[in-house]
Amino acid sequence: MKLPMAALGFVLGSAFFFLAGSVYSQEPSSQSPIFPTPQRLRTLGQQPDDGPVIMLNLLKFKPDGGRAAYGRYGAIAIQQIRRRGGEILYGGEVAGLLGPGSEWEEVVIVKYPSRAAFLDMSQDPEYLQALPHRDEGLDATLLYAFRPAEGLTRLDDDGDVPTVDAAGADAYFNINLLRYKGEEGREAYERYTANTFPLIAELGGRPVLRLVGEQPLVGDEEWDELLFIMYPSREAFLGMLQDPDYREGTPDRTAGLDNTLFLPTRMTLGGAR
């Protein structure tokens, strides 16, 4: 059901009230680096390497050709990723709920079979030759390493993390980066999700990925988890925010989070598209 524009405006205001509260978003800065430092790459290589690593890329392009330049980099990077058994789990454009929103423009979620595979790619001569296109294209980026949340991440029949299904032309995929207020904050947020996930299911949505943060490779914020949720439409998500049952759980969300970054997106890569 489509909401009238006046109602959407009211809901949008409520969305910012319920989703913001005492939490803060990290917007891109052109002063930030766009390449991982050697120290951060070494730290990644020192982590246990007994499963896949999933990289979240948030992208802001330079004006006047930045997106095209990054596309030239991406064409080579995708070949390198696939050569090592990795894949693009999801690619999408950041979509404002009623108009311009975050200054981040695109999100790409990439799965590598191991940390060694990612580090090997970062030293490949062919990949290194593509990096000037990345530099030419990006004004800012966030690159963060995650691993599947044991017992919480939906796996395919092979026990692997699946690509994200397209889920319909109107689907919204909401990225939630979460940092908790310690263990008590995590418990409060779990109460919030226990209340909210059934409401999402009633709308025809679902949690798609739940990942545990390992370390930033580019960017300074520390994140505990990434929660990636599909809604069948923008209206479904905004309508849920007005549900009294949803509102009942929002104090636990505010109590649980020390920081968050919320990005609504529309799919451009992944699944059936």
Go through the PLM ranges and name each one.
Residues 16-107, 113-123, 127, 137-248, ...:
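Short S/T/G/P-rich N-terminal loop/turn motif that feeds into the first structured element of a domain
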